[in-house]
Swiss-Prot record:
InterPro entries hit by this protein: G1P_dehydrogenase_arc (IPR023002), G1PDH (IPR032837), Glycerol_DH (IPR016205)
Pathway in which the depicted protein is active: Membrane lipid metabolism; glycerophospholipid metabolism
Taxonomic lineage from the root: Archaea, Thermoproteota, Thermoprotei, Thermoproteales, Thermoproteaceae
CC cofactor: Zn(2+)
First-tier enzyme category under EC: oxidoreductase
The encoding gene: egsA
Full protein name: Glycerol-1-phosphate dehydrogenase [NAD(P)+]
Amino acid sequence: MKQLESFEIPRTVIFGPGAISKIHQIVASQKASKILIITGRSVTLQYAKTIADMLTDRSVEVLRYDYIDIEKSGFDLVLGVGGGRPIDMAKVYSYVHKKPLVIVPTSASHDGIASPYVSYTLAQKMIKYGKIMASPIAIVADTSIILNAPSRLLKAGVGDLLGKIIAVRDWKLAHRLKGEEYSEYASHLSLTSYRIVVANAARIKNFVREEDVRVLVKALIGCGVAMGIAGSSRPCSGSEHLFAHAIEIRLEESGGDAIHGELVALGTIIMAYLHGINWRRVKKIAKLVGLPTTLREAGIDYDLAIEALVVAHTLRPDRYTILGDGLSKDAARRAIEATELA
């Protein structure tokens, strides 16, 4: 007999042009009087202030994610307004203080807009609090706002979605070889998100219409739900993400930066090759959308990419993938050269 299962997924999802106007309604449903809005810099900060102006009947504090004191209490509800970093920090605060979370994405560059989990690098920094897991009670995705995000970030959202084909294959592999628990339902949701964006890639690639953003947001939210059902990021994060994380860690140490979804797209091409599936098709879709399809286009040094492939498997030793016990440097070079990334 199987054990009991439980999972948390967003209770309310509101998306479309003007969705931001519904925030007061969501806040009222929570009977929250003291609200913390965690946001980013410049444009996202302005959106956060706009939301604060909608909540003048409440006590609202707006803070940038890099100014947050995680230990400070006294709020009834947390709003994460912005891109990846503000949203992730809002999840951390929500988890630590056990307060409800509302996510208001101003871009759609990755599936964190609906997932309970934070980025690998932030999770490591916040390890003293345990495994961060904060499923939002509501997601308010105003597509008229997201449409104004830099197109490079929206294309990165497609890159993150391309990785789902690898994540699910890695999960199946771990299930077959290591007996890891596997959810057909969560996998199906993740792959459906992948298929939606691939089927519409040619139509949405320039992100000039509201419906283009709508397709992307729906797919990303689907991935967030998949992770909630699985109880982990497994259906949406495999070896392609380990490669991306390995690069992100090295860049952070050296003061560099990269766009997550672009790295995931490159990782997906490499891992498709290792899995023996059609990596050329993945690369073709990435190119069609306007994602980097070489290391040079992504601004990634060749030696850094080799190092990332060699060490990627060590980042999550509990997560078996096609990388197995790791690639040798020669195998890493062959993979990069075979996929014409260099």
